[in-house]
Amino acid sequence: MTNRVVLAYSGGLDTSVAIPYLSKMTDGEVVAVSIDLGQGGEDMESVRQRALACGAVEAIVVDAKDEFAEQYCLPAIKANGLYMKQYPLVSALSRPLIVKHLVETAKEHGGTHVAHGCTGKGNDQVRFEVGFADTAPDLKIIAPARDYAWTRDKAIAFAEEIDLPIEQSASSPFSIDQNVWGRAVETGFLEDLWNPPTKDLYAYTEEPSLGNAPDEVVISFEGGKPVAIDGRPVSVLEAIEEMNRRGGAQGVGRLDMVEDRLVGIKSREVYEAPGAMVLIRAHEALEDITVERELARYKRGIDARWSEEVYDGLWFAPLKRSLDAFIDSTQENVTGDIRLVLHEGRITVNGRRSEKSLYDFNLATYDTGDTFDQTLSRGFVELHGLSSKIACKRDREQ
């Protein structure tokens, strides 16, 4: 039986180089699968044609934009998904969806192997391979860029040597990954932590200091899901796309961070995620008024753990599924409207309303009509601090 390798194909350097290598290594055929996740830029048909030009026997494009938004980005909104309290999981969210479609393609097209173009330094090798092991353990996995020690400069030289149709060159050695949820840039001069990002590095966002007029927006949620913008019904994908445009025009969603990679190293990453950051901020603000205090406190820890599970490539794992169930159970009352102002790179919440709100004006007000019984406070304060008071007394006397 002929070996048939199903390759996750992005159209970039690593996976373009992988096609001729995989054909040679396995003495087989390569089926390239490209997933449209709303990354924009190059036409997906051009990507498909490039895969064929690089030697793939078949090249398949899957339009997964709505699926990505509804089944992967929406859970991230509900979980306020920010790894290390900053990174909105731009790449991490897309990997399990790519795994799913590669496995389906392998089943439909007689695939014996699956392959990716990830290096041995990154997180994506883990995300792909753990996903394959969880969902299709019989498929053999090949990672040519990692297992054959391809450095970026060697890959560029090889691509030029055999005239592979890719745009990357030694003078522009960035690694870029993007989808509708955001854009990630690494390597190149960014590896020196003292070098600031240059203006031409950004594509999803304008300079925050351009002086554009503030943009006020109202985002409506039902059960934690964004359902309308300024009163207009939208799908999750449409909400992300519109906030990408409007937030990006205001320079919202830029992030320059050093993150702790799963493989144990620290890596500098520059991200743009205007839609993700606006929707997560709005969702957090709505939870502030609709989720009870102790549940909200506990959920913050669950949100952080959920983000770590996704970042670590454990999308299909039992713990991740259980965290999903808990988070979904907290969203029943997360319904209402949040008004925000987007301006000069900032997201400012300035209005909140919900029929499910736990905010009681009569209890919160300091004016006439206050219904809060302050006579209860003295005893509450005494009991609340009693344990600490006793311990501190002991420590003073030692």
UniProtKB/Swiss-Prot annotation:
Annotated positions binding L-aspartate: T119, N123, D124
Binding site for L-citrulline: Y87, N123, R127, S175, E259, Y271
Record keyword Hydrolase present: no
Listed EC numbers: 6.3.4.5
Catalytic activities: L-citrulline + L-aspartate + ATP = 2-(N(omega)-L-arginino)succinate + AMP + diphosphate + H(+)
Any one GO BP annotation for this protein: urea cycle
Molecular-function GO terms, alphabetical: argininosuccinate synthase activity; ATP binding
Keyword annotations: Amino-acid biosynthesis, Arginine biosynthesis, ATP-binding, Cytoplasm, Ligase, Nucleotide-binding
Compartments reported by the entry: Cytoplasm
HAMAP family: Arg_succ_synth_type1
PANTHER family in the cross-refs: ARGININOSUCCINATE SYNTHASE (PTHR11587:SF2)
Family: Belongs to the argininosuccinate synthase family. Type 1 subfamily.
NCBIfam families in the cross-refs: argG, PRK00509.1
Quaternary structure, from the entry: Homotetramer.
Protein name, per record: Argininosuccinate synthase
Organism of derivation: Corynebacterium kroppenstedtii (strain DSM 44385 / JCM 11950 / CIP 105744 / CCUG 35717)
